[in-house]
């Protein structure tokens, strides 16, 4: 076949434009289109990312696809709705399989690329049509989002390695978690965060700490707020550095717990909830530091984005956050941010930043920007994915 023209079908799990997976797929598709890939994208809604991908020239379709996972079972309402939801999701997916098959039957699709690991529709359709399929494994699932694969994790792991299936893992640790380290059909390809040459430098910082991400348990905002509370108590003085929280609330009960903690400790005036923002890059450029407190971040798109924007990163030394710190040390011989393992260590970092001149961290910020430019540019990611497509298609055609 002519590899200069690849017809690819993409299965996406969300139309949310704020998440790292959504940002990554948008820049990836733009880059692949420039290389001759013709994308057809299926999304579960007609808003947000559906509209953005249509604007860049992708062919977009709607199908009410749902993740192939077990519903939540916490709280009386979720318990009552557990079986109805499970049946409803499976009915929607059965309908979506037929709908997507109808979309592509005359399109001569060369490869199917599912943008997350928690959906099996792409695998099923690829098997039906004899098309190679890629799982883009972006999540631990259990460790980061408390997601349980249906019918079980072992069934998914068998699917990842079955004939005609390939995988892209966004970190080495996620690849290890899913037991794909010795699988020839699996690759580690880091997300492309920003274009080469897009590093921003801003030495005129403003007086605030930043959290940017969804407000839900796995993202670790409550432990951050507890550590921040200790900072205010220990060395904040009468005018502590405020904490800005930029992000969508996706777990109202969790957010309520955070607000109750804030009120109980009398720090309402020091923490500002900004809601979802479209100017996160600017917030990063002006912050004294961004804190990445996720319990087990997959890749840590926000962390890398902050480094591109000249922002000091304070990160929980686990998962993808740890891997990025380790990559920085391996590449530069220096730390590219401030790691912590406990809330107490996070508090100490906040106190240190608050009590230091900005120039103390300028070398760390500059080193981090150099590392992410070399490892996590859009161009590097696009080239790696495109070359993997070619390898897969050559393998399937031999």
Regions found by a protein language model. Give the residues of each.
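Nucleotide-activated donor-binding/catalytic signature segment of Leloir-type glycosyltransferases, i.e.
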Residues: 255-275
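Glycosyltransferase donor-sugar binding loop
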Residues: 42-48, 193, 212, 242-256, ...
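A short, well-ordered alpha-helix in the C-terminal region of glycosyltransferases
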Residues: 360-375, 387
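Carbohydrate-associated surface elements
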Residues: 173, 192
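Aromatic "clamp/platform" in nucleotide-sugar-dependent glycosyltransferases that forms part
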Residues: 276, 295
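Short hydrophobic beta-strand element within catalytic cores of glycosyltransferases
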Residues: 312-315, 319-322, 326
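A conserved mid-protein helix/loop that constitutes part of the nucleotide-sugar donor-binding site
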Residues: 19-27, 207, 214-233, 253-256
